[in-house]
Amino acid sequence: MSLSRLSSPQTFSRVFIVARGAATGHAVAPSSDNSIGYFEKIAYRFKGIPLPTETEAPKSMFDACNKEWSAPELLPSVPKDFKEHPDRDLTNYPYPSRPMYPPKTRLLMMPDSWFTAFQKVTGTSGPYLFFGGLFAFLVNKELWVFEEQGHMTVGWILFYLLVSRTAGYKIDAGLYKDYQERVGFFKGLIQEDLKEAVDFRKTSAAQTASFAALKEGMPTSLKDSMQLQLEAAYRKNVQTISNEIKRRIEYLKETEETKARFERDQLLKLINDSVEKQVSQKDFQEKFLQNAIQQLKGIAV
Amino acid sequence: MSGAAKRVATSSVNWSKLAERLVPEHAAELTRVKGVSGTFQSAVSQLPADLPKIDFAALKKALPAHSAVLDSLQKQYESVKIPYGEVPAEYLKEVDQWVDYNNARIKLHEVKVADGLQEAKKVEEKWAKAPPVEHFDRQHFVEYFPAHFYDLRYQNRIPDPCNIGLNETPEIENRFKDYKVLRRADKVDDH
């Protein structure tokens, strides 16, 4: 609030220092709540001063009183070279940008710019004397006539001061937040409008890159596929011939094996027949028994 | 063996790297080619590359009775020549046809991109020329957000601060077109 500039921070700081000193003095006392009086506790609570047994300052509803609000982030300024129209004269008619803070005033209502023109010539008191004299002249000549209810303006001024001292900080913070939200809404509309253009640029760039890659890779892949088909067919033929030659060699080997197996079978058959023929004779049985008995006798010894 | 001048055992295309750069439509095209190529690639990897070497001398020792047959087999085997062949020219022409088609497609895409860029530049220039939103004056809101604001100085419409749709129907305009008060359109004035 512009009126907060008229208050003197030094006075408040001095009072605050005195209060802090009082707290410090009490902290040296023995650490018990009984050392601080009942009404002094209430005063500490109102001022937001921690008690000796507390580590943090208590939350007070008066924290925002007599506090001057300032924007955490200033509004973006208009670019220096911004022109609404090519013919605009930026030197004599700059773009009327919105100021962040109201201009400085004196005595709650007079613009500071009215005073600075006089101040170079007459000093600090000159403007006050001029406007005061002018006011007195107007009142004296009944050019400025007071209404019977005019004295209530003083009350309104006091009420305004009361509200701005107490709730001004929160009002300013809330208004700033609402303004940011409102501007954010419009910025969202702008981004929504630009989103289509941005998306189009991205999509078209991706498609262009895709076309380039396809143009580069697709003919090669097609020809490679056909070459691979040739190679596959060739290898198929190779396999066919390999199978045929292996089959014939296996046939020849099988022929030899069959012949050898047949010879062996015939030989075994001949041997078996001879043995059976010999066994069936009676002389062989007697000769065999004699041999068996002789062998048994030898074993008995 | 084969007298082929050039043999391809594997594809020279890096499919994964190529697929990363493609948009889904083109990736679908490449996937079809990759499928066919993959079929042949698997066949190529499974089948033998060349005719095996056969030791006929050892066979002759093992099978002396068939040495004559083995001799003739050896002659036949050594004289075998498997033709490799070439890709038919008409198929290569088809590849060229596809290249022409793709070039035409690319040209069409470039034309579309140029038109789209013009539209995009219009929008971007519009907002580049606009002052910051924080410093909009009253007429700027009407100019840049016509859907949300109106200016009765030059727009023929009825103020509708509560947004109840007074401008959506012509009834009010027709009702008050005649300056006479509370006169219905169907009232007969025959006094």
From Swiss-Prot, chain A:
The keyword Glycoprotein does not apply. One of its GO terms (cellular component) is mitochondrial inner membrane. It is found in: Mitochondrion; Mitochondrion inner membrane. Pfam families: Mt_ATP-synt_B (PF05405). SUPFAM superfamilies: ATP synthase B chain-like. Its main location: mitochondrion. GO terms for molecular function: proton transmembrane transporter activity. It comes from the Eukaryota. Mitochondrial membrane ATP synthase (F(1)F(0) ATP synthase or Complex V) produces ATP from ADP in the presence of a proton gradient across the membrane which is generated by electron transport complexes of the respiratory chain. F-type ATPases consist of two structural domains, F(1) - containing the extramembraneous catalytic core, and F(0) - containing the membrane proton channel, linked together by a central stalk and a peripheral stalk. During catalysis, ATP synthesis in the catalytic domain of F(1) is coupled via a rotary mechanism of the central stalk subunits to proton translocation. Residues 1-21 form a transit peptide. This is ATP synthase F(0) complex subunit B1, mitochondrial. The lineage of its organism: Eukaryota, Metazoa, Ecdysozoa, Nematoda, Chromadorea. Keywords: CF(0), Hydrogen ion transport, Ion transport, Membrane, Mitochondrion, Mitochondrion inner membrane, Transit peptide, Transport. InterPro entries: ATP_synth_Bsub_B/MI25 (IPR008688), ATP_synth_F0_suB (IPR013837). GO terms for biological process: proton motive force-driven ATP synthesis. Belongs to the eukaryotic ATPase B chain family. Subunit of the F-type ATPase which has 2 components, CF(1) - the catalytic core - and CF(0) - the membrane proton channel. Disruption phenotype: RNAi-mediated knockdown results in sterility. RNAi-mediated knockdown does not affect the timing of hypodermal and vulval development. It comes from Caenorhabditis elegans.
